[in-house]
């Protein structure tokens, strides 16, 4: 079973392009777009580890939401932000996707897949939130956390 229910987190972190910030704040929600879930990390340490294994690996292959083989493009930290969000309570919609691996895989691969699976958590549907903060990605990748409060349209 690839999906397992997860407890409701008190806060989550979401990597997105800066160009998306205005519409996210207008909506007061993270939209799932072409996937069944929208994805988050439960801590900045998990976010950094997740980024190091995904978006920071230019050219690394991955499977997109539709099962299409893709490759990570060059990551531009100045074009992205990390949003720290307080989810509005949505019982039962949080899931963890356990990385699928072939039967009889070497123990090292099993361990790597299990560790990767713990880095992210999915929310089924669009996630409404409150108390948003925007974290500068370039500074974050250099070890500094520079954040600012941002307000949704309904909070203004």
Predicted regions and their residues:
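ADP-ribose/NAD+-binding catalytic cleft of ART/PARP-like enzymes
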Residues: 1-39, 52-55
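Hydrophobic beta-strand residues in large extracellular and virion-surface proteins
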Residues: 12-13, 24, 37-43, 81-85, ...
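Short, charged/polar surface micro-motifs in flexible loops or helix N-caps
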Residues: 18, 44-47, 88-92
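Short helix/loop capping segments that flank catalytic or ligand/cofactor-binding pockets
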Residues: 23, 48-50, 94
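Segments that shape or occlude catalytic/ligand-binding pockets
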Residues: 32, 47, 107-108
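A generic structural motif
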Residues: 36-42, 110-115
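Short active-site loop/helix that positions an aromatic residue
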Residues: 44-61
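Active-site and NAD+-binding cores of ADP-ribose-processing enzymes
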Residues: 58-156
